[in-house]
Amino acid sequence: MDEKQIFQEMVTILKPYVKDPALLENATKDTHILDDLKVNSARLVDVIIKCEDVFDIEIDDDDADQIRTIGDAVNVIQGKLN
């Protein structure tokens, strides 16, 4: 799975957790999950668990702590898939 596919899947995963789905329409790798998309930190944990299920990977606490933007999530996932 390439970076673009992972990014698109991340947008799909984030949709239920974003209060205003329109915010995802112009999302980029630099979009901050907590600040720009208004996902609270408790919901971010749910997003990470969903990523683990969808991509069949395990994201440890150190990797989870690095996830701030959609691009951060893509990089962590890509690293786990390779």
Regions found by a protein language model. Give the residues of each.
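Phosphopantetheine carrier-protein modules
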Residues: 18-36, 54, 58-66
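Two-component histidine kinase catalytic core, primarily the HATPase_c
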Residues: 43
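Juxtamembrane helix-loop boundary signature in multi-pass membrane transporters
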Residues: 80-82
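Thiotemplate assembly-line natural product biosynthesis machinery
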Residues: 1-23
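An amphipathic alpha-helix signature
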Residues: 7-11, 15, 30, 48, ...
